Amino acid sequence: MIDETSQALRDFSQRYCDLWQQKSGHAPASQELYGIPSPCVMATDEDEVWWQPRPFTLAPNLDAVERALDIRLQPAVTAFYTSQFAGDMTGTLDGRPLSLVQVWSEDDFIRVQENLIGHLVMKRRLKQSPTLFIATTDSELEVISVCNVSGEVILEQLGTKKRQVIASSIENLLIALQPLIINCSN
């Protein structure tokens, strides 16, 4: 499951970067990540950074999250967050836009783990089954998460028990996800 998830993420990343190249003539670009150090940075101009995915250089685990909550995480979630450094990538699944949360740098990896811990603590306080977010949506009240019990990818409404299965696994989500370029500059 780990290798399959990592490969599916690499494949989606390649499709995403290829689309950027096709539409703009250059690698993915981001204004939000401008000025933030990362091994992904290829070049910068006056207000944006051009980037490409890079190999993950830290220990490939989410041990800090597991220790903080005394929980074993779905191996696919660990693979998703520890396969590469990259900027967040947008795509559509069945017409629904989403943005995959990615790790931009070693420092960002700490922030992502802290946010995962916060999300799991919230789920525990609400007496809900544990989930781990992997993508955002246009709505601040909904996220794309992985059910830590089943491994299914779900659209969940934060603070409620409302959830909808959208893929049987992260791998299947990434295979079905179509790259989407939101702001493409030439």
From Swiss-Prot:
Compartment list: Cell inner membrane
A GO CC annotation given for this chain: cytoplasmic side of plasma membrane
Gene3D superfamilies per UniProt: Syd protein (3.40.1580.20)
Annotated S-S bridges: none
Record keywords, A-Z: Cell inner membrane, Cell membrane, Membrane
Membrane topology note: Peripheral membrane protein
Keyword Transferase attributed: no
Chief place where the protein resides: membrane
Membrane-spanning segments: none
Record-linked Pfam families: Syd
Keyword Chloroplast recorded: no
Physiological role: Interacts with the SecY protein in vivo. May bind preferentially to an uncomplexed state of SecY, thus functioning either as a chelating agent for excess SecY in the cell or as a regulatory factor that negatively controls the translocase function.
Annotated family: Belongs to the Syd family.
NCBIfam families (UniProt xref): PRK04968.1 (NF003439)
HAMAP family per record: Syd (MF_01104)
UniProt protein name: Protein Syd
Lineage of producing organism: Bacteria, Pseudomonadati, Pseudomonadota, Gammaproteobacteria, Enterobacterales
